[in-house]
From Swiss-Prot:
Proton-coupled chloride transporter. Functions as antiport system and exchanges two chloride ions for 1 proton. Probably acts as an electrical shunt for an outwardly-directed proton pump that is linked to amino acid decarboxylation, as part of the extreme acid resistance (XAR) response. The lineage of its organism: Bacteria, Pseudomonadati, Pseudomonadota, Gammaproteobacteria, Enterobacterales. This is H(+)/Cl(-) exchange transporter ClcA. The record marks 203 as: Mediates proton transfer from the protein to the inner aqueous phase. Disulfide bonds: none annotated. It comes from the Bacteria. Residues 109-116, 177-189, 193-201, 387-401, 402-404, 405-416, 417-421 dip into the membrane without crossing it. The gene is clcA. The record marks 148 as: Mediates proton transfer from the outer aqueous phase to the interior of the protein.
Amino acid sequence: MTHSTQQLSPEGVAEGKRGRLIRELVNRDKTPLIILIMAAVVGVVTGLLGVAFDRGVDWVQQQRLLALANVADSALLVWPLAFIMSALLAMMGYFLVSRFAPEAGGSGIPEIEGAMEEMRPVRWWRVIPVKFIGGLGTLGAGMVLGREGPMVQMGGNSGRMIVDIFRLRSPEARHSLLATGAAAGLSAAFNAPLAGILFVIEEMRSQFRYSLVSIKAVFIGVITSTIVYRYFNGERAIIEVGKLSDAPLNTLWLYLLLGIIFGAVGVIFNALIFRTQDMFVRFHGGDWRKLVLIGGLLGGMCGLLALLHGNAVGGGFALIPIAAAGNFSIGMLLFIFIARVITTLLCFGSGAPGGIFAPMLALGTILGTAFGLSCAHFFPQYGIEAGTFAIAGMGALFAASVRAPLTGIVLVLEMTDNYQLILPMIVTCLGATLIAQFMGGKPLYSAILARTLAKQEQARATVIAQEPAVENTPQTGR
């Protein structure tokens, strides 16, 4: 009997198996090259936006302070001018948000999370200019807001802009570049590339669709945005507190205690934010005129507070190294902490375009320093350096509120360049996260997104309920 095929030898079988394995390995990762190229473009665009936004805010603040310095000798001029300038700047931000892009209000991070789940729209053509110019107004007014929220939202919208400009149709490209822009935005805001990556993977874990394509895109976008940022601003740490000593092992229990305290503080802080948001909604009732007026009053108040006690207002980055160095007494630290909690709640809870990262980091630094000074007083045998507790506190409040401990740890270490404090940071942030979870607290951004979606559904249900009434009016002839 003749055979049309020849039986393979054992060597031929092995060779064929090796060839098949190689082909499977080569074909396993078919990453669309266009997505990776566009991720680099998104990173560059976001980095440039970050540099422009950062410098724009600094310029507005400098011009405001320069104008006040020119009339500093006249009390009759400096106080009214401080109120009026900050009020007008803030009103500009509130007006743009309320009239042109309501989704640009607040941090903007929950909007990106909702967009990643296809639950919130991404209208980049109006969000980017409104968030940019509105943020210049509110942050330039000296309000207690951060720059990172606007950067994350503008970065995510930049990703969607690139998708639309280059007509990328695949859902994978739309999702990957949206996440890439968000990560690149955080990286550009804090000069913290690894924290930008972890923020998307950890904090947005419910929305982020983990795949080889998406993770590579995020890496590339973060790298390019960081390169752009460092090209213009240098490679130094964004918060310079100096090199602190490592924490002795016999003091780790104090860091755990600090984490427990911050866990409770984080839950209370989040609850107060939600109550403040509800309070402002009751005040303005959706009327944009009332909202703009409220924003003007808040901005003017921050302008006056800047003259009375400058540490109570502003983003807080300038305050962090001063507080961490132990330049305030425990009583003064607690006073500043309470004052900044109130101003943070009012500014962020009102819906002003601006983030809460920086104010939160400042609050953590202040309370952490107060705790460290207290420990140094009660436990002199440990030789405690209060600044180490300040650094741990920065990450702990973030971890308890946002419920992203790994991001909080890496973010603070990258920002301060004190990597030797990683062990006390882990202990503090883990303790804060566990206590916050035990107390039933909800992650800040996820809770804000849930509230936004609930309002969206309520508005939709109201519209649907009104439709039959419109159809049955006498004017319809029915």
